[in-house]
Curated annotation (Swiss-Prot):
One of its GO terms (cellular component) is nucleus. Disruption phenotype: Decreased response to nose touch, but normal motor and sensory behaviors and normal levels of glutamate receptor glr-1. Small but significant decrease in response to high osmolarity. Decreased reversal responses to direct stimulation of the polymodal sensory neuron ASH as compared to wild type. Defects in male mating behavior; reduced efficiency in locating vulva of partner. Alterations in AVG interneuron synaptic wiring in a dmd-5 mutant background. SMART domains: DM. This is Doublesex- and mab-3-related transcription factor dmd-10. Keywords: DNA-binding, Metal-binding, Nucleus, Repeat, Transcription, Transcription regulation, Zinc. Its main location: nucleus. It comes from Caenorhabditis elegans. Transcription factor. Plays a role in neuronal signaling in polymodal sensory neuron ASH, downstream of sensory receptor activation. Required for maintenance of AVG synapses. Residues 316-348 are annotated as: Disordered.
């Protein structure tokens, strides 16, 4: 049964199969005809202003009909020359020989669909010569007649217009390439420049500052920029009590206005982990210090913290192995170190 079906299918002639026509759009001749039919001519004045608009039924609606720019001036000159040349061809026939058309045979045959330009100067004198390879051998190359002069002037105008079109095409390609590169490097989902600036500014302001600043300067300008207020000078003035021969201690009397109005002294919790030089391993000692800070008022708490930090600084300076140059320079360096350390402690 299967063999009979296969035999019948083999014996079916090819003509009985459905014939699907080959799409005509794939053939070369039809494509060229389609291209010829769909060729669109654009208004030259609108093209000068980068606005491609079809020329058909556009003359009365052209927004650049009265434009006096340099590019549109070339279009107007070319139009005038074409009108003049047509008038010469109609009314100024020099003799009978010029009225007869002389065709110069060309070895190259005209291909189907190929545009073959002819020499305009020879055409004005009744001859038809192919333009390819004819420029130097043209017998009317330097003809002084009025028609050849019009043709030469029109050729110059056309060359200028071609330069303008090439420049416009080049600018369009450069703009397209620039936009594509910009869209690839900077996608739309990336944050804007203002958002990036605010993010960087916020990260700089919230970045942690070092606990000890450089001892090269004793001025209060070395304070951290994130400090919300500027401390007054009497807060850091030393007193005669609890002074060592080489160091100075901060004052024991703090103005009540600073202690009462500054929320930084009372609201922020104090932890001994903020002092890296304070190596207290006994939990009871740490608890006593914290209880002392919690029970005392703001002035006594600040005095206790500064005294503890001063003692740690003295111990660290005595253990350092770098000798000082002389007594006066050593005193000045220690004063600068103490003042900078006090400023950093208050900032923390």
């Amino acid at each position: 049964m299967v063999a009979d079906v296969l035999r019948q299918s083999v014996l079916v002639p090819i003509s009985m199969y459905p014939q699907y026509p080959v799409p005509r759009r794939y053939t070369t001749s039809v494509f060229k005809e389609y291209q010829k039919k769909k060729k669109i001519y654009y208004c030259q004045r609108c093209l000068n202003h980068d606005v491609p608009r079809p020329r058909k039924n556009h003359k009365c609606e052209c927004p650049y009909a009265d434009c006096t720019c340099e590019k549109c001036g070339l279009v107007e000159k070319r139009r005038i020359l074409n009108i003049r040349l047509q008038n010469y061809n109609q009314f100024n026939i020099e003799n009978e020989n010029d009225s007869k058309l002389i065709i110069v045979e060309d070895d190259d045959k005209k291909k189907q669909g190929e545009r073959v330009p002819n020499c305009q100067k020879c055409g004005q004198h009744g001859r038809k010569s192919r333009l390819k390879g004819h420029k130097r051998s043209c017998p009317f190359r330097e003809c002084p007649c009025a028609k050849c002069a019009v043709v030469s002037e029109r050729q110059k105008l056309m060359a200028d217009q071609i330069k303008i079109r090439r420049r416009q095409r080049k600018d369009t390609l450069l703009t397209f390439a620039k936009n594509s590169i910009t869209s690839t490097m900077f996608p739309s989902n990336q944050i804007s420049l203002n958002a990036l600036n605010s993010l960087l500014y916020g990260s700089i302001n919230t970045s942690p500052q070092p606990l000890l600043s450089s001892p090269t300067s004793s001025d209060a300008s070395s304070c951290s920029p994130s400090m919300p207020f500027t401390p007054s000078i009497p807060m850091f003035m030393p007193t005669s009590a609890d002074c060592s021969p080489t160091t100075q201690t901060p004052t024991s009397s703090i103005p009540s206005s600073i202690a009462s109005t500054s929320p930084l002294m009372t609201s922020l919790p104090l932890r001994l982990s903020g002092f890296p030089l304070l190596n207290i391993r006994d939990p009871s000692a740490e608890a006593s210090l914290l209880n002392l800070g919690c029970n005392a008022d703001a002035a006594a708490l600040l005095k206790t913290i500064l005294d503890q930090y001063r003692m740690l600084e003295e111990a660290s300076m005595s253990m350092s192995s770098s000798p000082s140059k002389d007594d006066e320079s050593g005193d000045e360096d220690s004063d600068g170190l103490n003042s900078n350390s006090i400023i950093d402690v208050i900032t923390v």
